[in-house]
């Protein structure tokens, strides 16, 4: 995934997340079509860095905001599920980085990664987005979007420096 954030000024947090999610799914599909092994691994590593930025930013901004207004035990368990989901995706990236692209196991694990990412997207869109809409007004959602963009930009810069 390109670490360069999409320019969507004034967008609320849900739109910023939708854009990130769409880019992840599209770029993961592209990894499947690259036939050169080195390019496949390079694309996968770029996507992994983008995922790391997205996940950390989502945890710092969105989950923290929801935890601040959701003090119930069940919502705490759901937050734990989301953190675990992020860890599963990262673990799958670990496994893929040790495999030869386009071999049977690599493709199988790539399919699992796609399923995990799709589950993450669906959970965000169908569970978290409605909760955000219930708990925050338009101005607050826009502010969360700005906080997300700022945090994402900072983490992106750090990831780029680490990769250089």
Regions found by a protein language model. Name each.
Residues 1-164:
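Small-residue-biased structural context
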